[in-house]
């Protein structure tokens, strides 16, 4: 990849990163465990729609699974994101030691809120870069 292409991609990421940080924060604030991420998937679907992706929901019969697609030709680039919270990992944000919001509650102690939003930002940047460069 050329330096120019790399700079273009980073500029695309930088232009949208605040919106995706806000997405990660909203998901963090609503910790939902595996197969129960109903609000989190709504947040991701809303972002996919805003970014112009075609959306398939209820993938493999899972109401919290979603696919976003862009373009009509190959090659196909797949990026996996996840946004489930984990039981017992409730945690105040920005605190390095264990400090649960709710003792024994669910939380994003492993950063899955970040995995989902970062994967979606990466997919958006690639989509936008391909649209710009052909």
How would you describe each model-predicted region?
Residues 3-108, 113, 117-134:
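Acidic/His- and Gly-rich active-site-bordering loop/insert found
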């Amino acid at each position: 990849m050329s330096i120019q292409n790399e700079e273009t991609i980073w500029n695309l990421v930088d232009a949208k990163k605040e919106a995706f940080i806000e997405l990660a924060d909203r998901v963090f604030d609503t910790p939902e465990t595996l197969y129960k991420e109903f609000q989190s998937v709504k947040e991701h679907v809303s972002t996919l729609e805003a970014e112009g992706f075609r959306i398939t929901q209820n993938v493999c019969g899972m109401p919290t699974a979603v696919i976003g697609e862009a373009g009509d030709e190959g090659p196909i680039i797949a990026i996996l994101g996840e946004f489930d919270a984990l039981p017992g990992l409730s945690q105040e944000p920005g605190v390095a030691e264990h400090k649960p919001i709710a003792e024994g509650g669910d939380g994003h102690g492993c950063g899955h809120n970040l995995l989902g939003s970062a994967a979606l930002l990466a997919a958006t940047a690639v989509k936008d870069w391909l649209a710009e460069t052909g």
